[in-house]
Curated annotation (Swiss-Prot):
N6-carboxylysine: residues carrying this PTM: 198
Role this protein plays: May be involved in sulfur metabolism and oxidative stress response. Does not show RuBisCO activity.
Protein name: Ribulose bisphosphate carboxylase-like protein
Metal-binding keyword on record: yes
Amino acid sequence: MNAEDVKGFFASRESLDMEQYLVRDYYLECVGDIETALAHFCSEQSTAQWKRVGVDEDFRPMHAAKVIDYDVIEELEQLSYPVKHSETGKIHACRVTIAHPHCNFGPKIPNLLTAVCGEGTYFTPGVPVVKLMDIHFPDIYLADFEGPKFGIDGLRNILNAHGRPIFFGVVKPNIGLSPEEFSEIAYQSWLGGLDIAKDDEMLADVTWSSIEERAAHLGKARRKAEAETGEPKIYLANITDEVDSLMEKHDIAVRNGANALLINALPVGLSAVRMLSNYTQVPLIGHFPFIASFSRMEKYGIRSKVMTKLQRLAGLDVVIMPGFGDRMMTPEEEVVENVIECTKPMGRIKPCLPVPGGSDSALTLGTVWRKVGSVDFGFVPGRGVFGHPMGPRAGAKSIRQAWEAIEQGISIETWAETHPELQAMIDQSALKKQ
């Protein structure tokens, strides 16, 4: 690529109609001449060849991805990761902002991903280390997406739960219970105060606990719990499956008593999520399997908040994500970023409920609330409810009691003096530390 060719892949914001472009932020490590490497990077993901031989034309003004800003962070002695490459020369770490014309792929998530994090992005000469840090969508692009059907307000209205977090619980043991056993445990947790009892992301439609039988038992238990507590409840059924089975599993689960559905968003694909969101009449909740495999490396892959944003775009009403606990191995800053992506303005797209989770209990509720910075989040203990020494009903009560302490502005230790379920969790934690 000569110097004139390189210029065709650079532009200023002022020279572009930015409503016609997605803006992407990347961390890149470039080998050799930086601007040549960046031009190749834009070319490979858009106009790899911008004219026909012997024809006086240039498709770059309309169709090329273009660098609109870049900053050289530092010169490196070697690449951050031993990625195989053939280029030679100095290595520079760069922050790069690229405008990509969305007419190249339209409002279609598979085509969008192919352009911004596909072959062209990760196989560009001179750019062996790549991390997609963010995507910014213009309102004209967002207008073609439906987004969450219910969102935060819709879910709160279903549950009549306002001014506080939404309390989920992952029924445990997560694998191995019969539908009858599973439903009894969920029922007890609803009586104790959970809003939503959910299948684990690994429990879907299996021979020993079919979605049909499990949903029937849980639907009956849910209605019984609603009658006894006077509170709406949700059974969240996992319908993750092959794409050609999703509609059938949806119908079976809802017909038999599930009133919200769990989907492992990346394993089934965001296009499948969008299809389900457009079809369903119950809230759709996403879980995070597969994302860490390409988001955890600091300088390579895709930053997790990009996937959170895309899950919201695809129509998830709730996004479950790695939370603040040490077990989740996620920096606090990254968790907060993901929470913000669920709720910040996004054109016509409704906010979705963020659920940062991982090894939570009544003892961590206050910490999660303070770090999230609002009540618009879901709290999703597993063993913190179902491993409670007094049983799942008491485990759920301990969560509600911890929230009462927060509302009263007093410590959970003080509140626990008159609330034995909360005291039992404190005592159990103290024993584990011995």
